[in-house]
Amino acid sequence: MNDFWQHCSALLERELTPQQYVTWIKPLAPVAFDASANTLSIAAPNRFKLDWVKSQFSGRISDLAREFWNTPIEVQFVLDPKAGMRSAAASAAPAAPRAPLTPGGPAATVAAIAANLTANAAAAPSAPADVPMTPSAAAAHHLNADDADIDLPSLPAHEAAAGRRTWRPGPGAAPANGGEADSMYERSKLNPVLTFDNFVTGKANQLARAAAIQVADNPGISYNPLFLYGGVGLGKTHLIHAIGNQLLLDKAGARIRYIHAEQYVSDVVKAYQRKAFDDFKRYYHSLDLLLIDDIQFFSGKSRTQEEFFYAFEALVANKAQVIITSDTYPKEISGIDDRLISRFDSGLTVAIEPPELEMRVAILMRKAQSEGVNLSEDVAFFVAKHLRSNVRELEGALRKILAYSKFHGREISIELTKEALKDLLTVQNRQISVENIQKTVADFYNIKVADMYSKKRPANIARPRQIAMYLAKELTQKSLPEIGELFGGRDHTTVLHAVRKIADERSKDAQLNHELHVLEQTLKG
């Protein structure tokens, strides 16, 4: 059994990207093999990993097991028995004060974390020494901040003085009165409308949503930090607000803060101007959950990055959860310090892709329903087919349709929709051409554009050509025969094969998915 798993792991390590292997395969362990029943049991450390590995890798592991034993093997995925023991220990553990972790040290057990959550307070760690900023550097980082105070929601006086944390398990319900709820939302800057319940899920965001729920259920334990990246309007901000809102319901008194990266930069500038870094650090280092949006705005701002690094280290050491969003993969954010990039990579990084057709339809139907409008599926499909980039664009188009319908006193139909979105559809149709896709893909994979039309079949040419066909089908209104004609007169079945092949591989191969994401963002400008 162990020999097989070493063999299997070695093969999968070669087949998968390092991130895929470390995230999904390395944590697995074989726990039982029944030769008489031809069954192999493999344990996963938590339910989230178990479900994902079962859905994404069970087929490949079963194939490798069959090849190894020369007979069909039923591979069963089970929850690590030690996880159950840890969970039981957590429920029985007495309350204990927090024990800060050293950065990079071993992860705390579930029992220790559960005990920490019951502690009423613990001293926050002292921040590393501040590095002075030269006047010229300060001027370079100045953001025309106004004279308002630093945007730090007020803390109770005794907590502010002691830098104490007050995360206590709550009754799983909202605050008892509206005033208290308003105060909580004012301090946290959360949008109470953005919840898991009204987040539309599809293939493009299912992993991100699953990870977000896991973090909301086990803050500071499961994935820290959680880093979500993707283009504008794909739901990153919705998801992180949903995590914060869920935590407010589950844990009364949790100290939560949502902040856009630009506001954080502004806070750093004002703290420097007023020599108020002690207050700044006391506030940010004492949070239980920090949600920071669009961290790419930290690019080139060295003092902000330095302060955020200190805050990050203090929060993670105290088992507080950090969640970050960006418009691109961490290592591709320019102007960010390497030590911050390495901290981002230490947790779980998940992409949110543009929504697929069915998801776009569901978003439109859900949004129309919330507006009290009965939108037909025909209209929803028409809009979803023509607008592909992001959720925000879809919602904007729907608002335009509703306003046009109301103004003209006509029922919503495909004809009315075409009229209402005339300008938008014209822009969309001329934005991306098959020729542009071919050139962009050829440049990306370092081949000639002429190779897109040629009959050459080496892998280094055939693969980019298939990717270009897939993108042509996804990003233009061309039919399969039309796309085939533009790729050297190929038959539509060749295009269909390429589209299906790349779509299937995209769902399994993180590296390919990332490359397609980059190409799509490049083509959409």
Curated annotation (Swiss-Prot):
- What name does UniProt use for this protein? Chromosomal replication initiator protein DnaA
GO cellular component, as recorded: cytoplasm; plasma membrane
Q: Which GO terms describe its biological process?
A: DNA replication initiation; regulation of DNA replication
- Please name the source species: Burkholderia cenocepacia (strain HI2424)
SMART domains for the chain: AAA, Bac_DnaA_C
Q: Where is this region: Disordered?
A: 162-182
UniProt feature, compositional bias: Low complexity: 169-181
**Task performed by this protein:** Plays an essential role in the initiation and regulation of chromosomal replication. ATP-DnaA binds to the origin of replication (oriC) to initiate formation of the DNA replication initiation complex once per cell cycle. Binds the DnaA box (a 9 base pair repeat at the origin) and separates the double-stranded (ds)DNA. Forms a right-handed helical filament on oriC DNA; dsDNA binds to the exterior of the filament while single-stranded (ss)DNA is stabiized in the filament's interior.
Keywords on record: ATP-binding, Cytoplasm, DNA replication, DNA-binding, Lipid-binding, Nucleotide-binding
NCBIfam families, per database record:
DnaA
List ligand-binding residues for ATP: G233, G235, K236, T237
Q: Subunit structure of this entry? A: Oligomerizes as a right-handed, spiral filament on DNA at oriC.
* Residue segments, region Domain IV, binds dsDNA: 406-525
